[in-house]
Design a protein with these regions (language model features):
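Periplasmic c-type cytochrome electron-transfer domains
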Residues: 1-169
Length: 169
């Protein structure tokens, strides 16, 4: 056992971790359909969330300040020592998001409803707040209760039960 072999084994294992059998994936393949509420959620998601959560993994792979209240955790700023990176955290993939609670880098939200409530009315104006969360000087992302409910229904279509229940993992 050497560090190189451990790295190679871990790399091979991680290459096996492919989640691509969710309802969303089946819709893309033409073997399933969204409900009307899921379709409405997808539309709302594309309009209000996809600037950060895009692509097949539903992440832009960047680091952003998403308007959480400031804590001692400087996020990426602790690594880069760049003040512009303070309180910026990795934009996560939303694949299997319904199974990955608690949410945010510090686990402060226990439900997707609370996450969407944060973006709708809880965004804090901090020095490094991402500009997407401060359009025209207004904080947050305007979301109706129906949009939030439908977005959550859409997000649930990103869950791949086959992957989650795979006995190999």
């Amino acid at each position: 056992v050497t560090p190189t072999r451990m790295f190679q084994a871990l790399s091979q294992f991680m290459c096996m971790l492919v989640s691509n059998d969710s309802k969303y994936d089946k819709v893309l393949k033409g073997t399933a359909s969204f409900t009307s509420a899921e379709s409405l959620g997808k539309t709302a998601f594309e309009q209000k969330c996809a600037s950060c959560h895009s692509g097949i993994l539903f992440t832009d792979r960047t680091f952003k300040n998403n308007g959480l209240s400031l804590t001692a955790d400087l996020g990426r700023g602790r690594v880069t020592l760049n003040p512009n990176d303070e309180h910026c955290f990795k934009v996560p993939s939303l694949r299997n998001i319904a199974k990955t609670y608690p949410y945010m880098h510090d686990g402060r939200f226990s439900t997707l409803e609370k996450v969407l409530d944060h973006y709708a009315s809880g965004v804090q104006n901090t020095p490094t707040l991402d500009t997407l969360l401060k359009p025209n000087g207004q904080l947050g992302i305007p979301l109706t209760n129906d949009e939030k409910a439908n977005i959550i229904l859409f997000l649930n279509t990103l869950t791949d039960e086959t992957f989650i229940k795979n006995p190999l993992f």
